């Protein structure tokens, strides 16, 4: 799908890194602002080099959320992964970490905004709105649950 936009110069002002997966590298796809990568070994370096991630809405988007990279999500609509991808996308959009692109027209609209260097897309995201995850959060949730039970035990 990305080739459609590269071929008609829609995204000439944007550098694109396309992770294509093992054995999917295509030497015929040559564009000045486009680079294919089969696999990323160091995700820290990769994430520090991007401003926006366009991807499906599987579990892999959580790393981007954790380090506040805005997302354009295109949930997979077929098969067994469709339900969790829709749920992930819905939650991330509601939390202002992502924008949902449910069809090619909505994705093209966002690409055109980016091409015009329209930063409103980034302003829509809560850059400092970190989802509460990680060990400290989990430990505190467990302690809260234990405290609820301890209080219930002493009340009865």
Feature names for model-found ranges:
Residues 1-156:
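Nucleotide-activated sugar donor-binding and catalytic core shared by glycosyltransferases
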């Amino acid at each position: 799908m990305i080739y459609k936009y590269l071929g008609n110069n829609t995204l000439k002002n944007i550098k694109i890194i396309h992770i294509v997966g093992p054995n999917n590298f295509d030497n015929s796809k040559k564009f000045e602002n486009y680079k294919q990568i089969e696999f990323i070994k160091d995700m820290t370096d990769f994430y520090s080099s991007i401003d926006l991630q366009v991807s499906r809405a599987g579990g892999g988007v959580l790393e981007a959320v954790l380090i506040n990279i805005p997302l354009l999500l295109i949930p997979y609509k077929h098969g067994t992964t469709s339900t969790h991808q829709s749920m992930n996308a819905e939650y991330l959009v509601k939390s202002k970490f992502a924008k949902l692109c449910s069809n090619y027209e909505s994705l093209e609209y966002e690409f055109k905004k980016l091409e015009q260097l329209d930063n409103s897309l980034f302003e829509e995201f809560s850059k400092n709105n970190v989802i509460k995850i990680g060990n400290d959060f989990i430990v505190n949730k467990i302690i809260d649950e234990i405290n609820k039970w301890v209080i219930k035990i002493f009340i009865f």
